[in-house]
Amino acid sequence: MKYIIVTGGVMSGLGKGITIASIGRNLKDKGYKVTAIKIDPYINIDAGTMSPYQHGEVFVLKDGGEVDLDLGNYERFLDTELTRDHNLTTGKIYLEVISKERRGDYLGKTVQIIPHVTNEIKSRIRKVAARSGADICLIEIGGTVGDIESMPFLEAVRQMHREEPSENIAFIHVTLAMEDLQGEQKTKPSQHSVKELRALGLSPEVIVVRSKSPLQESAKEKIALFCDVPQELVISAHDADDIYEVPLEIEEQGLTTQLMKHLQLESSVENGAWKKMVSRMHSTTNTVKLAIVGKYTNLEDSYLSILEAVKHGGIDNGCRVEVNMVEAEILEENPAEIEKLIQYDGILIPGGFGGRGTEGKMMAIKFARENDIPFLGICLGMQLAVIEFARNVAKLKGANSTEFDEDSPYPVIDLLPEQTGVAEMGGTMRLGDYEAILTEGSIAAKIYGTNYIVERHRHRYEVNPEFVDRLESYGIVFSGKNKNRMEIAEIPGKRFFFGSQFHPEFRSRPGRPSPPFNGLVAAMCKYRKEREGR
């Protein structure tokens, strides 16, 4: 097994995840099987209970793991499926070490950071890498070098470097070159960051430097000299128009070749699919406008996978999707604002929790339905579409979800039966992959091209089966089901009106878009042409 370990310095949020994903993409295009592990040095067991404002979206894996959004980038770039074990947290490590101590596994020894915690970290990394069957395992250590939280993980990989043959492990350090008022890129923060890393016993083979513009030659020379790496291994990771360009940018600088040389890997395979996909992305000539009506609109990372899935649909349909975030509560406070949605070619209601903004979202759903604007509702978005339909079409006055109104006379959305009595929040929802059978001839069957699908879920509430027949008699169709669970709702005869209880965005890939998103964008493109009289 070959390991590539990525650390970060100067500040957090530099893009270590995109760096790892891009390196992995390029190695995959050389014919290697690649996997990735994200280490998050927080005490939370997973990301499931974190606020989107604090940590961005929670990405859901096939096995139900609720993880950091970086794993979503890994899956999209590497076109792979990971598991909850690919996300290590301090909480997971300490929980296991303490459990072993309580069982007596340490045979009366004093349990310490070294060796017990570091051994657990190394063991988990190696087990995950081995189980994946990969040739190369990329590891991102979250946070910044110098953070007290990441010390045990840095010590663990230092020990791995000592235990593994030198040709089996490579270290990459991501830093930042800031520009002064004269436009000169300053290298001192990078120098100090590498110095701090070396004080921990780690020396990077490669330094990836984030910057606004391409790294100046003088800056590259300074970093190479003072950080003691060859100049060709100082890589410019300057801002790109789109993150999907990053693999191509670092490939042009020879990083893949240099890593393969260090790891003693050889390959004559050249897969140009990624380059072709990026070329298609840039060759789009038409633009359509999408409104995402939500409650976490101030932080785009809250809806990262949705934005990426929309982009994938745009690439496949040959158009650029201009996305605007609309705060649902603004529609509630000023109902006249709803008329502004007429300018959009599509409306999307994402998932979420809690009652804040739900009435505003339903106003947007009603507007989309009545004006026949292509619509996609995801998870809570589908549930709200069902409530809106029940209220305004089926005339069930007061219809609601028991999440928002336990005394609703028409609880068309209700708690999953198995959720009754569940007290803990973390890891207790209906999570991960579940199948659905699609109705033949439905919109769902048409866009998926099959009657059997598997998609990822994250919810506690569902369409109440007691109301299904009554609602369907008014024209809505529940075209995807898991036994007696409603997975998809659609309204035939519309340009595109589709809701999914699952989260299709988590399985969307560049070059292989999620069918609901592809269907939405296709309908938007067609609608735009109709509006322009083409």
From Swiss-Prot:
Ligase as UniProt keyword: yes
Reactions mediated catalytically: UTP + L-glutamine + ATP + H2O = CTP + L-glutamate + ADP + phosphate + 2 H(+); L-glutamine + H2O = L-glutamate + NH4(+); UTP + NH4(+) + ATP = CTP + ADP + phosphate + 2 H(+)
GO-annotated molecular function: ATP binding; CTP synthase activity; glutaminase activity; identical protein binding; metal ion binding
Annotated binding of CTP, by residue: S12, D147, I148, E149, K186, T187, K188, P189, S190, Q191, K222
Remarks, miscellaneous: CTPSs have evolved a hybrid strategy for distinguishing between UTP and CTP. The overlapping regions of the product feedback inhibitory and substrate sites recognize a common feature in both compounds, the triphosphate moiety. To differentiate isosteric substrate and product pyrimidine rings, an additional pocket far from the expected kinase/ligase catalytic site, specifically recognizes the cytosine and ribose portions of the product inhibitor.
Record-listed E.C. numbers: 6.3.4.2
Taxonomic lineage from the root: Archaea, Methanobacteriati, Methanobacteriota, Stenosarchaea group, Methanomicrobia
Assigned keywords, A-Z: ATP-binding, Glutamine amidotransferase, Ligase, Magnesium, Metal-binding, Nucleotide-binding, Pyrimidine biosynthesis
Gene that encodes the chain: pyrG
Family: Belongs to the CTP synthase family.
Protein name (database record): CTP synthase
Region (Amidoligase domain): 1-265
Source species: Methanosarcina barkeri (strain Fusaro / DSM 804)
Role: Catalyzes the ATP-dependent amination of UTP to CTP with either L-glutamine or ammonia as the source of nitrogen. Regulates intracellular CTP levels through interactions with the four ribonucleotide triphosphates.
Residue numbers annotated as active site: C379 (nucleophile), H503, E505
Regulation: Allosterically activated by GTP, when glutamine is the substrate; GTP has no effect on the reaction when ammonia is the substrate. The allosteric effector GTP functions by stabilizing the protein conformation that binds the tetrahedral intermediate(s) formed during glutamine hydrolysis. Inhibited by the product CTP, via allosteric rather than competitive inhibition.
UniProt xrefs under HAMAP family: PyrG (MF_01227)
InterPro entries: Class_I_gatase-like, CTP_synthase, CTP_synthase_N, GATASE, GATase1_CTP_Synthase, P-loop_NTPase
Intrachain disulfide bonds: none
